Each structure stands twice: as C-alpha cells, then as structure tokens.
Design a protein with these regions (language model features):
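Acidic, surface-exposed loops and disordered segments
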Residues: 1-201
Length: 201
C-alpha cells in the first residue's frame, strides 16, 4: 500500500472485532517502526506508550472512557503519554553520539527553548504525540489494521487507573485491530479556500 492509499483508507473505526488478535511480536514490530521513524522536535522523542493488554485494566479504562467499546474490543490499545521533562532528563543521552560541537549547540538550544517555559513544554509533547499517533495509524493501515484515535475519556481518572507518573501527561488513546461493519459516511470537509491562505491572513 502506498502512502496516499493509507491516508485515504484510514478511518476512525468505532466498532472492532473483539475476537481478532494481534500477536505480541507483531505489535512490537508495528510500534518499533513508529518509534524509529516518527519525527520530533530536537529528536527528543517525547512519547511514552502504555500498551494495555490486561482485560480487567481495559474494562476499568472503559468505565472512565465514556463506555466506548473500542477500549475493550480492539486488538491493541495504547495510552499515548509523553514525558514533560524529557528535554532535561534525556537530551544528553539522545545527542551523545553526535559530533561534540553539534551536541553542545543542540543541548544549549534545547535548554534555552524549554527551561522555565511550561506552556512550551506541554505544547511540544502534544505536537510530538500528534505526529506519533498519525505515523502509527498509517503504519497500522499499511499492515491491514484499522485504528481509532480517542480522547473521549476522563483524563484524571485514566491517570489514576494507569498510575501515571507525575511528570507524564496523557495525550490520547489509540485503538488498533480489525473493524467490523461499514464505517459511517465521511462528513463534509471545509473547502480549500476556507482552510488555506497564502502568505498572510
């Protein structure tokens, strides 16, 4: 499948075949591709993934997730989180193999960009999570899987349920598996002229 086909065929699947399973090794391969090839600001790779396989944990998440069936019925459920402090805790590790001069420049730039700027820190993890989510869903589509990005849930209760570390934030959930039934018709999209402006507003 080429990229444009994956983009056109991907839909937010609401109903999954609960009997369909994805072997753990295939889950791992899918995630490894997304982890390896998704871009992120300063290559900080802000994302942290919680893959929820346990049936009881899925049921608990569904209770605080507006009772959405994707949470329990999909073959793979990921709570996509991000480390707010990664700019400080991991930057030297991430850039350690770079040319020393480049490494020093990048580490200094990261520090200047993020330090004492909580809004920037949060904005960046959400941007990176969005890039990761779309990459993962397109890779899943290429493998013949359906997916659904989800944010209809109680973030505070999900955080309690998964024992979220204090320096992490929940970005969204992603359900992956085999859809069943026909998807709803696509809703209309904004016109090109309404969505796109050249040079200035």
């Amino acid at each position: 499948m080429n990229v444009i086909d994956a983009v056109k065929n991907r839909r937010a699947t609401k109903q999954f075949d609960a009997d369909f399973k994805i072997p753990r090794e295939e889950k791992k391969a899918l995630l490894e591709d997304a982890l390896q090839y998704t871009p992120s600001a300063f290559n900080l790779q802000h994302w942290r993934l919680l893959v929820v396989d346990d049936v009881k944990q899925r049921q608990a998440l569904r209770k605080v997730g507006w009772d959405q069936p994707q949470i329990t019925d999909s073959a793979m459920l990921i709570v996509l989180c991000a480390d707010i402090n990664v700019w400080e805790s991991e930057v030297k590790t991430i850039w350690q193999d770079a040319n020393p001069e480049v490494r020093d420049i990048m580490c200094s730039a990261v520090d200047s960009y993020y330090r004492n700027k909580p809004q920037v820190q949060r904005d960046e993890i959400m941007r990176s999570a969005g890039l990761f989510a779309q990459t993962l869903m397109l890779l899943a589509q290429e493998r013949g899987f359906d997916s659904c990005p989800m944010d209809g849930f109680d973030f505070a209760e999900v955080a309690k349920t998964i024992n979220l570390p204090d320096h992490y934030a929940i970005c969204l959930m992603i359900a992956i598996g085999k859809g069943k039934g026909k998807p709803f018709p696509r809703l209309g999209k904004l016109s090109f002229d309404k969505a796109v402006t050249f040079d200035h507003f």
